[in-house]
């Protein structure tokens, strides 16, 4: 059902009565794959969702799924511009429903005021190192602009971008 790949790491796997949901990582990004036991489905939720996976500055994972006999899978999503969101995804009709989204204190936050992007730096050994950037959309990008930088990367550990 799942072929071996040196480029893909399986982080989590949930079994349901008619399908399995696989949380896998490739190039530092998490993808959620749905595979039906009868070979009737095999797709990535990232490609069948209204959530923004285009700018690649997100965290995405399987949520708490206590029901075995269901066609729904609970997921957790957030990005550098979207607060933590719990949603339920129907694997048959590929529709999602937001169950809960983290409230931002002060109620003045508007994600449309921010932009995020994913860039890469090349290490001495030629490996590409992902860099996630979030900024106000009006921030000037020049050498006078202050920057808060945080990073970690070793032993296969990835720091996923998260809303803060």
Description of each model-found segment:
Residues 1-10, 14, 37-63, 94-112:
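Multi-bladed beta-propeller domains
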Residues 6, 15, 26-28, 80, ...:
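Short strand-connecting beta-turns/loops that link adjacent beta-strands
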Residues 15-17, 68-69:
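Residue-level detector of Asp-centered blade-edge/turn motifs that repeat once per structural unit
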Residues 20-22, 74-75:
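Conserved beta-propeller blade signature
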Residues 25, 37-39, 91, 136:
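Inter-blade boundary loops/turns of WD-repeat beta-propellers
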Residues 28-36, 81-88:
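Structural motif
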Residues 53, 61-164:
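Serine-hydrolase catalytic core recognition
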